[in-house]
Amino acid sequence: MIHQITRAGKSLLAAGCTLSILFASDSYAATALNVSQQPLFLTQGVAPNLLFTLDDSGSMAWAYVPDGISGNSGRAGRSSDYNALYYNPDYAYQVPKKLTLSGDQIIVSDYPVPRFTAAWQDGYAQGSTTNLSNNYRPQWGTGWLGCIDSSCNTGRAYYYTYKVSASCPAQPVSSSNSCYTYNALPTSQESNFAIWYSYYRNRILATKTAANLAFYSLPENVRLTWGALNTCSIGANSRSCQNNALLQFNKQHKINFFNWLANSPASGGTPLHAALDRAGRFLQTNGTAYTTEDGKTYSCRASYHIMMTDGIWNGRNVTPGNLDNQNQTFPDSTLYRPQPPYADSNASSLADLAFKYWTTDLRPSIDNDLKPFMAYKSGDDSKDYWDPRNNPATWQHMVNFTVGLGLSYSLTLNSAPTWTGSTFGNYEELMAGSKAWPSVDNDAAPGNVYDLWHAAINSRGDFFSAESPDSLVQAFNKILTRISERNTSSSKPAMTSALQDDGTGDKLIRYSYQSSFASDKNWAGDLIRYKVESTSTGSTKTQEWSAGALLDNRAPATRNIYIASNSGTNRLKPFTWSNIEGSQLATWLNRNPDKDNQADTKGAQRVDFIRGQQNMDGFRQRQAVLGDIVHSSPAVVGPAQYLTYLANPIEPSGDYGTFKTEADQRSPRVYVGSNDGMLHGFNIKTGVEEFAFIPTAVFEKLNKLTGISYQGGAHQYFVDATPVVSDAFFDGAWHTVLIGTLGAGGRGLFALDVTKPDDVKLLWEYDSSTDSDLGYTFSKPTVARLHSGQWAVVTGNGYGSDNDKAALLLIDLKKGTLIKKLEVQSERGIANGLSTPRLADNNSDGIADYAYAGDLQGNIWRFDLIGNTRNDDPDTNTSINPFKPGDVDPSAFRVSFSGAPLFRARADNNTRQPITAPPTLVRHPSRKGYIVIVGTGKYFEDDDAQADTSRAMTLYGIWDRQTKGESANSTPTIDRNALTAQTMTTEANSTFGSVNRNIRLISQNPVKWYKDGATGTANSDVASYGWRLNLEVNSSKKGEMMIEDMFAAGQVLLLQTLTPNDDPCDSGSTSWTYGLNPYTGGRTSFTVFDLKRAGIVDSGSDYNGSVVSAFQQDGLGGLAITQNEQRQSEACTGDECIIFNPSDKSNGRQTWRVVEEK
């Protein structure tokens, strides 16, 4: 629909405003273009080092945990309530994975399920067997036990359960056999018991299986070496260690690891110091730790050590001293003074050794380019540095993840830090240092167990205390999740807010819906709802649900996934094999993507996979059901969008008030596109997926999702664009309609009626089979009322159409038929396509009058949607000759200025500057016409990942003077020489309060609109037609571009730029957030951003007395504009919200609100 914009100093919904715009967003692609099917901002990356140490001590052969119950092998020892290693009838034991190599392809299968009458005593060796039906004897230490009760003399497998009673306390005890009830194993549990017996019965078997199940899905880009406490040294590359050199975890090296793991023995002591020291020295001395097979050295390679043990360390033969209790200077020049939770009074503990290999630059000869892991941000950089949950180290160092099996019983000292089940569960107590780490020594309990925990903290890792096979699997999985590549997304968050009564009836509660993906997790995606609350130093986010986690735990058959149908009132049918068998879609799904789409008969299985079935043989092994969400921002559908008094005049025959009353009561949804082939609709309160739709335009490549090769370079985009939601009128009633596009996923768009969230209807689909001029649908549509009377979807045709044309498409909202196509002139031989349009309502009557859009050839086009000559006067907002909807025939719609562009964007070297972001409009300060603001840049082809430093991209503000509805047959010749130039004068690093930032200063050159002595306002009187700002600092061209939406908020133009970076030791791109004067393109006269996160914008955020116009800010996908609880304006990325001032009089609480982008 239509939204108003402001002149300087007015509210964004000011009563006297005479210009309205219909918002929309980006676009991309073309047949002559090489449209990337992977996120361009993902560099190949540098594979991390992972060192794995297994405890192979003699106690690993024992069949009980913890050590302290060694004398309690009676009934308690044969109950999982007391001995967590014993068979648990409530747990479904999983067989481990077996990996074999076929050519270059890893084949993953399951180890066989043992027979109950012949279960292997070691499921990996598969030698001796036991008949569990008549010859079962429990294992305790390294030997076997006989039966206790006469009821088990038959020798059938059995277990005991503990029952709480007046004489049997809640905590299971071993002293009273009467508290335990004997259970002969029922027939239904025979297979489960046999799996436990062969693969989990004792510590070494349980550890092997837990590691097996975690490591089989470890990303192949990780580099792995392994070792044990007694029998194998890390990095030895010996045959006895199965050739354990530090290599990428793929092909034969992966097979070697699993073979070594399966054959690891259990004998010897527990020399953890020597093992940790070996790992650290390997990273410090072995040349392969930071080089690749091609000999390149990378300074950003992270290194992690996983050390698993079941016991209390002994054999302390490494004595580093009491390092964590000594003053020292870290490699980044940070001064360390002993402080909690790092320091203690113990000398040469595991914690000291871990501290040594974290604080020491293990390779001082190479640069310190490791990326800090700062998951917890308080707004105080110094506090965040010392937060043990973060890892600020940029130098080469080792992070330890320690795992203790059956050791939680030792973590109970009242005088020591309180163990609550996780490393930082008692975070406040740890940071306060109110309880000291206990003393340690050889075989000392419980101090040596606390030392494992302390060692993880001192190296910025994690400690896991596992008591059962299940918790051991979870521990390994959590470690590998932490090590894996950070999740990221190229979409901005959806921000919603609501007033909540806090006693004053005036507390604004905000929610953020943040999408993400993880390429290293086989393209897993997620959508998370956060509650966002402001603090004195910024804002905090509290997760309320994860849609990805909820989908992983949902039965595929219960999902509501639909495709188009030619029948039925909703024109939708469930996506099941029975509904598509015999169709063209079934033919496409009966193709093997790993064998050049050869026909097979697995279409039904592929349907099951797409619906969410996991662990299917021969198909891709995903780590999550929800696919990657890269460029699609969430769209929230809740109450009605508009005020009744504004909506009713647009459709006098409709009753928006009644519609609004009903819509305000509907169950809210959040919709987002994903590259699993679907548009998803989630319940906004619970995160449960309520609806999903697979567009017809992606049918042909759905089978690719199942391919084993998909993890590599075979990734595809599917529904990779932001849905647009708008209220509109048709069929005699108001509706809420969602328009979906595909981005790089395909050449199509679709419309869904989402008025009733539990009764979604498909209105239509429009794709390249209907219109060959439709390219990849990067252009974000706008829903608008036209002067012809129709409600329409107005969109650019995108890139990659059959003829590489550029055109504005007007599609009937109800029918999906083409109302009008306005094709623009394109230079032949150069790919073209129209980007996202911005629509303008000239007199605020709710009907679109103009559309502005750029194209790939660097032209800015205006489209007249008014018809014949109109005589509105926007300066006074007086409609002299109003038009009613339906007065204009669509044939009167045309390209303005007789088919000529308003402006041609050319760089200083006269090369074309592509325009892929939508324009933004502001009222010209003279009240004559509008300033059309555009930025240049392109970021969707594979080559765009390489920064173009041959020229600078530019921000432009172009004065369109002919906007009164008059015939505009020509426009003045405007080139960059007719524009006032602004420049970036300074780029610097500075600290604001306690926050360190990279910032930029920009010139403040005045724009002289009219010539000196001019007495009129004719074109001949004009001195400048606008402004321009090259995206370069001191003529240094780094490839910075503008590809996202801009926002004109009051007297500030807000935008985010992107600079590609293909250095594997750097992020794939960097982003800068700008706050400019929209009327000059230069520096504002007032401070814009709260750079110091103080909760107020003042001169403390200036640099050397000058207003900062830009700062480097993490997060991709552009900005979301919102307000915090104090009604202060905030610009948000996925990573940070920062307060900004929209005008020189708007510091503090705001009385205006930001209009959401449409």
UniProtKB/Swiss-Prot annotation:
GO terms for molecular function: calcium ion binding. SUPFAM superfamilies: Quinoprotein alcohol dehydrogenase-like. Pfam families: T4P_PilY1 (PF05567). Keywords: Calcium, Cytoplasm, Fimbrium, Fimbrium biogenesis, Membrane, Metal-binding, Pharmaceutical, Signal. Coiled coil: none annotated. Ca(2+) binds at residues 841, 843, 845, 847, 849. InterPro entries: PilY1_beta_prop_dom, Quinoprotein_ADH-like_sf, vWFA_dom_sf. Disruption phenotype: Loss of twitching motility, predesposes to autolysis and impairs the secretion of quinolones and pyocyanine, but on the other hand promotes growth in stationary phase and bacterial survival in murine airway infection models. Has reduced congo red (CR) binding which is a measure of Pel exopolysaccharide (EPS) production, and shows both increased swarming motility and an altered swarming pattern compared to wild-type. Residues 1-29 form the signal peptide. One of its GO terms (cellular component) is pilus. Gene3D superfamilies: von Willebrand factor, type A domain (3.40.50.410). Belongs to the PilY1 family. Contains a region (residues 173-365) weakly homologous to eukaryotic mechanically sensitive Von Willebrand Factor a (VWFa). Overexpression of PilY1 represses swarming motility in a pilus-independent manner and the repression specifically requires the diguanylate cyclase (DGC) SadC but not other DGCs. Increased c-di-GMP levels upon PilY1 overexpression in surface-grown cells, but only in the presence of SadC. Involved in pilus assembly, twitching motility and adhesion to host cells. Primes type IV pili (T4P) assembly and is required for inclusion of minor pilins PilV, PilW and PilX to the surface pili. Stabilizes assembled pilus fibers likely by antagonizing retraction mediated by PilT. Calcium-binding and calcium release by PilY1 seem to be essential for twitching motility and for regulation of pilus retraction dynamics of PilT. Regulates surface-activated virulence possibly by acting as a surface-attachment mechanosensor. This is Type IV pilus biogenesis factor PilY1. It comes from Pseudomonas aeruginosa (strain UCBPP-PA14).
